[in-house]
Swiss-Prot record:
Pfam families: TatA_B_E
Family as reported in the entry's similarity comment: Belongs to the TatA/E family.
HAMAP family on file: TatA_E (MF_00236)
Protein transport listed as a keyword: yes
Name of the featured protein: Sec-independent protein translocase protein TatA
GO cellular component: TAT protein transport complex
Assembly notes: The Tat system comprises two distinct complexes: a TatABC complex, containing multiple copies of TatA, TatB and TatC subunits, and a separate TatA complex, containing only TatA subunits. Substrates initially bind to the TatABC complex, which probably triggers association of the separate TatA complex to form the active translocon.
Species this chain originates from: Pseudomonas fluorescens (strain ATCC BAA-477 / NRRL B-23932 / Pf-5)
Keyword Protein transport: yes
Function: Part of the twin-arginine translocation (Tat) system that transports large folded proteins containing a characteristic twin-arginine motif in their signal peptide across membranes. TatA could form the protein-conducting channel of the Tat system.
Entries under InterPro entries matching the protein: TatA/B/E (IPR003369), TatA/E (IPR006312)
Gene: tatA
């Protein structure tokens, strides 16, 4: 006899089913199962040797030139349309 006897586990299981319902527990089990499958598949794919990557032919890269920016004294504007946001209605008032 430990802290949790089999009778305790039955009571806990009944309470969990009453609180969450069988549909949510089924969905939770399905989601956990799919996550485990995805994890195992990713682990198996990781063990397979990757295809060797062939480096592209060496081509000269032109030097990067800085872009011309607007003078600092001009204001920066964003051209978007404003949208009206309504306050949510409270149920208790």
């Amino acid at each position: 006899m430990g802290i949790f006897d089999w009778k305790h586990w039955i009571v806990i299981l009944v309470v969990v089913v009453l609180v969450f319902g069988t549909k949510k527990l089924k969905n939770l089990g399905t989601d956990v199962g799919e996550s485990i499958k995805g994890f195992r598949k990713a682990m198996n794919d990781d063990e397979k040797p990757a295809e060797p990557v062939v480096p592209p032919a060496a081509q000269p890269v032109p030097p990067v030139q800085p872009q011309q920016s607007a003078p600092l004294n001009q204001p920066h504007t964003i051209d978007v349309q404003a949208q009206k946001v309504e306050e949510p209605t409270r149920k208790d008032s």
